[in-house]
């Protein structure tokens, strides 16, 4: 059996840190799409909601190409560092400190399971 990438979805600058998103993505890598959607629906994490939307988008991209969604497997699931939001927070005695909010680029690539033919062997 061989797997090739058929669709991809990216969410840029998601308002979650890459570390927290990658904890959820690590559980999904290499799993079938139906299983991953089921797992995400019961996960009690903010990242699960964001990742589920990205996964739905990747499945929709595959369906546009006419691929059966039941044969899809998650090949690549990663969270890269995005831009950092900075804003000033007032403090005592007229000072201010910078607040930093991390963002991440969440990428999910799906592949289709194909059975090897007898000629390829």
From Swiss-Prot:
Keywords: Ribonucleoprotein, Ribosomal protein, RNA-binding, rRNA-binding
InterPro entries: Ribosomal_uL22 (IPR001063), Ribosomal_uL22_bac/chlpt-type (IPR005727), Ribosomal_uL22_bac/org-type (IPR047867), Ribosomal_uL22_CS (IPR018260), Ribosomal_uL22_sf (IPR036394)
Secretion signal, residue range per the UniProt entry: none
Gene3D superfamilies cross-referenced by the UniProt entry: Ribosomal protein L22/L17
Molecular function via GO: rRNA binding; structural constituent of ribosome
Matching NCBIfam families: rplV_bact
Family: Belongs to the universal ribosomal protein uL22 family.
PANTHER family reported in the protein's UniProt record: CHLOROPLAST 50S RIBOSOMAL PROTEIN L22-RELATED, LARGE RIBOSOMAL SUBUNIT PROTEIN UL22M
Subunit structure: Part of the 50S ribosomal subunit.
UniProt name for this protein: Large ribosomal subunit protein uL22
Organism field: Hydrogenobaculum sp. (strain Y04AAS1)
């Amino acid at each position: 059996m061989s797997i090739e990438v058929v669709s991809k979805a990216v969410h840029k600058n998601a308002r979650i840190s890459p570390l927290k998103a990658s904890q959820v993505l690590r559980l999904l890598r290499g799993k079938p799409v139906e299983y991953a959607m089921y797992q995400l629906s019961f996960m009690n994490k903010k990242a699960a909601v964001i990742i589920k939307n990205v996964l739905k988008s990747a499945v929709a991209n595959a369906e546009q190409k006419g691929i059966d969604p039941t044969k899809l497997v998650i090949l690549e699931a990663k969270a890269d560092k995005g831009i950092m939001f900075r804003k000033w927070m007032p403090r005592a005695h007229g000072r201010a400190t910078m607040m930093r909010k991390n963002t991440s680029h969440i990428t999910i690539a799906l592949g289709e399971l194909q059975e090897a033919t007898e000629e390829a062997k």
